[in-house]
Each structure stands twice: as C-alpha cells, then as structure tokens.
Amino acid sequence: MAKGILGRKIGMTQVFDEKGSLIPITIVDVSDNVILQQNSVEKNGYLSTQLGFSSKREKLSTKPALGHFKNAKTSPKRFIKEIRFLPGIKNELSELDLGTSLKTNLFQPGDIVDVIGISKGKGFSGSIKRHNQSEGPKSHGSRYHRRPGSMGPIKGKIKGKKLPGQMGHQTVTLQNLKINSIDHEQELFLIKGSIPGPRKGFVMIKTAIKTVIKENQDA
C-alpha cells in the first residue's frame, strides 16, 4: 500500500548483522510530520497528500501561508511537499484528516522505499569531473590537457551536450532502499545505504513505486 513521509538526513553510521557483516546506515529524523492538505481527482484532477515537516517561527511565513497552516491547525512548517498517488491504487494517507501527525509506525523494518532529495552541490565543474570524460595528453607540447575538445560542426546549442557547468544540487531519487530498523522513541529511520544530500538536508521517503505497481498487478 502506497504511503510516504518527510524527513531530515542526520548522517551515516554502521551496524553489524547476525552474521557479522557490516551494513552502512543513514539515519533520518522523521518527527514533526503533519498533513496540511488533501487533493482529490474530482476537485484537483489528481490524487495527492501535502505534508509539512520541521516547525518554524510564525514571522518567517507569509500571511497566506499562515492561513494555510491555520486550516490544518498546526504550526508553520519549513519543508512542504506533496506526495502523489496513482489513481486506483490504495494508499494510507488520503483518508486522514488535516492536522494529523504521522508517526514512525507508518513504516515497518524491512520495508522497501524510494528516497528523494537534493544532491550535494559541487559548483561549476569541468567535463572531466562532471561527465567522467578522458583527459588529454600531459606531455610537453600538447595543446590541451583538460579542455572539453571540439563540439563538432553543428550550428547552435544542442540540448544535453556534455559540457562544463553546474554539477550537483539536483533532485535525485534512489530506488529500492531498505529500512533496516526504526527507533520509535526518537522517531528515527535507519536506512540501509546512502541517500542524496548533505547532513541536515530534507528528504522524502515513499513506498517503492516498483513495489506498489507489482502489488497492484498481483491483486
């Protein structure tokens, strides 16, 4: 069944399983999740649930935003995202009332999830670092070392051409990650492997889309 929650990446650690194998773990704080809005196919044309995460001071919000939070009877939130659901597929969030707090028991250890976040920004980078292209000769007399080389005779710009430019700071989705364990007391998810973004970066955790589609086909 489809579901999702917002969180903040705390950092990485490691644990050992019963066989003594080392497992890299990312810790995600999922406390303070509140439902802000419900969108339906009849009214909005698509099915989704809007969530808010991480409270902030009222003076940091605009008046329209404060009215939006007031409708949900909650404090202003720093990170707001919509989790969209495929029509005809059951989900656990659409029937919940506005202002409902989501807890860690929404997911269970062993669940397979997709994690969406903003990758670390690397600034302006050359094509060798950005696209893993080969370097030129390093010997004396060579005309280029790390330049991108000829762009070809085609006139104008070509979309998707591998050139120097902004690297990182893009929305990245990692699929089929496993929730290794859950700390219900501190409201933490321990996810196997790494996830996008720096420490303290916001992420969205959803039931793996491939799992949802497979369950729907089997049903």
Curated annotation (Swiss-Prot):
The GO terms this record gives for MF are: rRNA binding; structural constituent of ribosome
Q: Name one Pfam family in it.
A: Ribosomal_L3
- Highest taxon above the source species: Bacteria
Q: Which GO terms describe its biological process?
A: translation
Region spans: Disordered? 124-154
The record's section on Gene3D superfamilies has:
3.30.160.810, Translation factors
Q: What keywords are assigned to this protein?
A: Ribonucleoprotein, Ribosomal protein, RNA-binding, rRNA-binding
What InterPro entries does the database record attribute to this sequence? Ribosomal_uL3 (IPR000597), Ribosomal_uL3_bac/org-type (IPR019927), Ribosomal_uL3_CS (IPR019926), Transl_B-barrel_sf (IPR009000)
Q: What does this protein do?
A: One of the primary rRNA binding proteins, it binds directly near the 3'-end of the 23S rRNA, where it nucleates assembly of the 50S subunit.
Matches recorded under HAMAP family: Ribosomal_uL3_B
Q: Subunit structure of this entry?
A: Part of the 50S ribosomal subunit. Forms a cluster with proteins L14 and L19.
Q: Which family does it belong to?
A: Belongs to the universal ribosomal protein uL3 family.
NCBIfam families for the chain: L3_bact
Its recorded name reads: Large ribosomal subunit protein uL3
Q: Which organism is it from?
A: Phytoplasma mali (strain AT)
Q: What is the lineage of its organism?
A: Bacteria, Bacillati, Mycoplasmatota, Mollicutes, Acholeplasmatales
Record gene name: rplC
